Amino acid sequence: MNKTSRTLLSLGLLSAAMFGVSQQANAHGYVESPASRAYQCKLQLNTQCGSVQYEPQSVEGLKGFPQAGPADGHIASADKSTFFELDQQTPTRWNKLNLKTGPNSFTWKLTARHSTTSWRYFITKPNWDASQPLTRASFDLTPFCQFNDGGAIPAAQVTHQCNIPADRSGSHVILAVWDIADTANAFYQAIDVNLSK
């Protein structure tokens, strides 16, 4: 094989590898409505957010929550150090959206579609402490809403109808999780809400 052929072959392999990486890297999404903590950073309703304001679709970490996945204290950032600001937790740190308990729509915007295992929604316990970092102990560990996709490729916009538990009121965090079927990862979106009946 001559030098030109080797160079062309190397460039071809490099291009294929980069295409594969870019395809995986583009498989992202965020909760558009009610706007997640990360998306509200992009909208500048949340401030001092760091780099997540430019890429709310990239809050991605290991799947398997609550048995695996992000470490306690790093759940909102999906354990991604570049988005550490999302893990800051005080009663007044994040803009809260007013929602009512009962039926609500949750809409994901996918910047690229990806084979999906499930979509799951967790909520903080009635007695959670809003002044402490989010941990598994903060949440009911059984999702209040779940949709299984069995590996299907979703549309670019996905809306789920979910019933927020009636025994919640006031400040809460809803954790929306998009579990990817063909990678070890999931996308995590914290949604800050103020609930009433």
Swiss-Prot record:
Location, primary (coarse class): secreted
GO cellular component, one term: extracellular region
Outcome recorded upon mutating residue 55 to A: Decreases the binding to chitin
Protein name: AA10 family lytic polysaccharide monooxygenase CBP21
Chitin-binding type-4 domain segment(s): 28-193
Protein function: Lytic polysaccharide monooxygenase (LPMO) that oxidatively cleaves alpha- and beta-chitin with C1 regioselectivity. Catalysis by LPMOs requires the reduction of the active-site copper from Cu(II) to Cu(I) by a reducing agent and H(2)O(2) or O(2) as a cosubstrate.
Cellular localization per UniProt: Secreted
The keyword Cytoplasm is assigned to this record: no
Gene Ontology molecular-function annotations: metal ion binding; monooxygenase activity
GO biological process, one term: polysaccharide catabolic process
One Pfam match: LPMO_10
Family: Belongs to the polysaccharide monooxygenase AA10 family.
Family matches, as InterPro entries: Cellulose/chitin-bd_N (IPR004302), GlcNAc_Chitin_IntDeg (IPR051024), Ig_E-set (IPR014756)
PANTHER family per UniProt: CHITIN-BINDING TYPE-4 DOMAIN-CONTAINING PROTEIN (PTHR34823:SF1), GLCNAC-BINDING PROTEIN A (PTHR34823)
Signal peptide: 1-27
EC numbers for this chain: 1.14.99.-
Induction: Expression is induced in the presence of chitin.
Keywords associated with the record: Carbohydrate metabolism, Chitin degradation, Copper, Disulfide bond, Metal-binding, Monooxygenase, Oxidoreductase, Polysaccharide degradation, Secreted, Signal
Result of altering residue 185 to A: Decreases the binding to chitin
Residues bound to Cu(2+): 28, 114
Record note on domains: Binding to chitin is mediated primarily by conserved, solvent-exposed, polar side chains, including regions Gln53-Ser58 and Leu110-Thr116.
